[in-house]
Structure formats: structure tokens, C-alpha cells
């Protein structure tokens, strides 16, 4: 049994989640690959039903409670929001977490980055620049990603390094998002952004792997999400 555990990379002494009874994913471990479907799923396979296929033109609305806490430490002060976005967009490099929540986490990371505020220099650790953001609330997201799986109230933590041009440092993110089944109205997720930080919303969203389109009404809709190597794209801004 011990040999089998070694092969599978299991550890018997890992702490278990009190709520789910399973060991939490190793969010900070390095891995040589990300998990993603390599081909379309055949409808005849087990568990595949109509929720796995969708009309890309069908508009859906996802209403949720969310919380995002972000800390960014850098070796030097950021000059523009483009510098911030280039760094923070690395948060899900080599992502290991709940796959169904990743598109929503991308939005929360984008949201948090627009609300970052610098810590007074006298309070910064060893004099290095620090930035913090804490956003929470209720919101709905218009999207064309098809039917999404149920989302539970389980926080996830991510810590990643970044090295973009002149900037080096770390990003720490704690995010929670779960279904809001109430009948109360909620604002769009985009209303929680600090839009004064930038004007080119579509371009900045793309740095986080978010493909958004503007409707005739002026509202933004999430069309799709990309999980490719956004580091090279982000570093070009």
C-alpha cells in the first residue's frame, strides 16, 4: 500500500477539509502540465448529457456571492495599470484548483487588480512596495459559456511569483464564489470594477484570458475564456 501511495503521490498525513473530508489541492506545487480536455467529449460517454453542449449564441446569467482578497508585492512601484495587469494575470499560471470555477476566478482576479491600493511605504515589508485589495458582494455575470456546474462556498488560495520586465514579486489571492439562489436583484459583476484605472476594458480583459464583447445596450458579456500561455501576451503590454 505504501508503494502505491508513493506512485500516486499520496501522503497519508495531509490535513483534510472539515467540510468535504478530502485533502485540499496543492495550489502551490509546481507541475509540468495543466489539466484540460484534449478533444470533444462523445455524447455516448458516461455522465455526458445536454449540459455539456451549448449554443454559443445563447446568453445566460450567473448570479453569485463573491469575495476576493489580493496582495501583490513588487520589487519596485508599478507605474501604470498595464504593469499591474501584466503581473497579476500570472496568478493562474500552472493552475491547480476547481476547474469549473476557473473562468470566474479570472474575472475576480481582474476585478481585484482594478481595486488595488498601495500600502504606505512605512508599513511595507522591508520597504518593498505592497498593494492590497478586498472586494466582496453579490453580482450576476452575463455569458455565453453554456450551463455551468453548481458552485459551493469553498474558498481557494493561490500564491504565484511573477517576473515581468523590471518587475519581480509575488501575488497572493484568496477567492470565494458560490451560487446566489435568492430572488433579490444584483448588479452586474462589471459594476464592481474601478473603471477609472483604465479605458480599454476589452484589451485589459484579454490579458486575463477573458474574451468579452459589448452588447448594443453597452453591457459587457463574457463570450469565452482562454487558458493558454497568457504570460507572453501580458508581458507585451
Curated annotation (Swiss-Prot):
Chief location of this protein within or outside the cell: virion
Superkingdom, natural source: Viruses
Residue ranges of the region described as Disordered: 1-23
Motif annotated as PTAP/PSAP motif, chain positions: 37-40
Processing after translation: Phosphorylated by host.
Biotechnology annotation for this entry: VSV is used as an oncolytic agent for cancer therapy, because of his wide host range, rapid replication and mild pathogenicity in humans. VSV used are mutated at M51R in their matrix protein. These mutated viruses cannot successfully infect normal cells, being unable to counteract the antiviral state induced by interferon-alpha in normal cells. Cancer cells are impeded with responsiveness to interferon, and then can be successfully infected and lysed by the virus.
GO molecular function, one term: structural constituent of virion
Pfam families: Vesiculo_matrix (PF06326)
Matches recorded under InterPro entries: Vesiculo_matrix, VSV_matrix_sf
Biased composition (Low complexity): 1-10
PPXY motif (motif): residue ranges: 24-27
Location(s), subcellular: Virion; Host endomembrane system; Host nucleus membrane; Host nucleus
Short motif dynamin binding, span: 2-4
UniProt keyword list: Apoptosis, Eukaryotic host gene expression shutoff by virus, Host cytoplasm, Host gene expression shutoff by virus, Host membrane, Host mRNA suppression by virus, Host nucleus, Host-virus interaction, Inhibition of host mRNA nuclear export by virus, Membrane, Phosphoprotein, Viral budding, Viral budding via the host ESCRT complexes, Viral matrix protein, Viral release from host cell, Virion
A biological-process GO annotation: symbiont-mediated suppression of host transcription initiation from RNA polymerase II promoter
Gene Ontology annotations for the cellular component aspect, listed alphabetically: host cell cytoplasm; host cell nuclear membrane; membrane; viral envelope
Membrane topology of this protein: Peripheral membrane protein
Function: Forms a double layer around the helical nucleocapsid, the inner matrix layer binding to the N helix and the outer matrix layer binding to the envelope glycoprotein. Plays a major role in assembly and budding of virion, by recruiting cellular partners of the ESCRT complexes that play a key role in releasing the budding particle from the host membrane. Condensates the ribonucleocapsid core during virus assembly.
Domain notes for this protein: Late-budding domains (L domains) are short sequence motifs essential for viral particle budding. They recruit proteins of the host ESCRT machinery (Endosomal Sorting Complex Required for Transport) or ESCRT-associated proteins. M contains two overlapping L domains: a PPXY motif which interacts with the WW domain 3 of NEDD4 and a PTAP/PSAP motif, which interacts with the UEV domain of TSG101.
Subunit structure: Homomultimer. Interacts with viral nucleocapsid; this interaction contributes to the virion assembly. Interacts with the viral envelope glycoprotein; this interaction contributes to the virion assembly. Interacts with host RAE1-NUP98 complex. Interacts with host NEDD4 and TSG101. Interacts with host dynamin. Interacts with host NDUFAF4; the interaction inhibits viral propagation and is independent of interferon activation. Interacts with host GTF2H5; the interaction may inhibit host transcription.
Family according to the record: Belongs to the vesiculoviruses matrix protein family.
Name by which UniProt lists this protein: Matrix protein
Organism (species): Vesicular stomatitis Indiana virus (strain Glasgow) (VSIV)
The encoding gene: M
Amino acid at each position: 500500500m505504501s508503494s502505491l501511495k508513493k506512485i500516486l503521490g499520496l501522503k497519508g498525513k495531509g490535513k483534510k477539509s472539515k467540510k468535504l473530508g478530502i485533502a485540499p489541492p496543492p495550489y502551490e506545487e509546481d507541475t509540468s502540465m495543466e489539466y484540460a480536455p484534449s478533444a470533444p467529449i462523445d455524447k455516448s460517454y458516461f455522465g455526458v448529457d445536454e449540459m455539456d453542449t451549448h449554443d454559443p449564441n445563447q446568453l445566460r446569467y450567473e448570479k453569485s456571492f463573491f469575495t476576493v482578497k489580493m496582495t501583490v508585492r513588487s520589487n519596485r512601484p508599478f507605474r501604470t495599470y498595464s504593469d499591474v495587469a501584466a503581473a497579476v494575470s500570472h496568478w493562474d499560471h500552472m493552475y491547480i484548483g476547481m476547474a469549473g470555477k476557473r473562468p470566474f476566478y479570472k474575472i475576480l482576479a481582474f476585478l481585484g487588480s482594478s481595486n488595488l491600493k498601495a500600502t504606505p511605504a512605512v508599513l511595507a515589508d522591508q520597504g518593498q512596495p505592497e498593494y492590497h485589495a478586498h472586494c466582496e458582494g453579490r453580482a450576476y455575470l452575463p455569458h455565453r459559456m453554456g450551463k455551468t456546474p453548481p458552485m459551493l462556498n469553498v474558498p481557494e488560495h493561490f500564491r504565484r511569483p511573477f517576473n515581468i520586465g523590471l518587475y519581480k514579486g509575488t501575488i497572493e489571492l484568496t477567492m470565494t464564489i458560490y451560487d446566489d439562489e435568492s430572488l433579490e436583484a444584483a448588479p452586474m459583476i462589471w459594476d464592481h470594477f474601478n473603471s477609472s484605472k483604465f479605458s480599454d476594458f476589452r484589451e485589459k480583459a484579454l490579458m486575463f484570458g477573458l474574451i468579452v464583447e459589448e452588447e448594443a445596450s453597452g453591457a459587457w458579456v463574457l463570450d469565452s475564456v482562454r487558458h493558454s500561455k497568457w504570460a507572453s501576451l501580458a508581458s507585451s503590454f
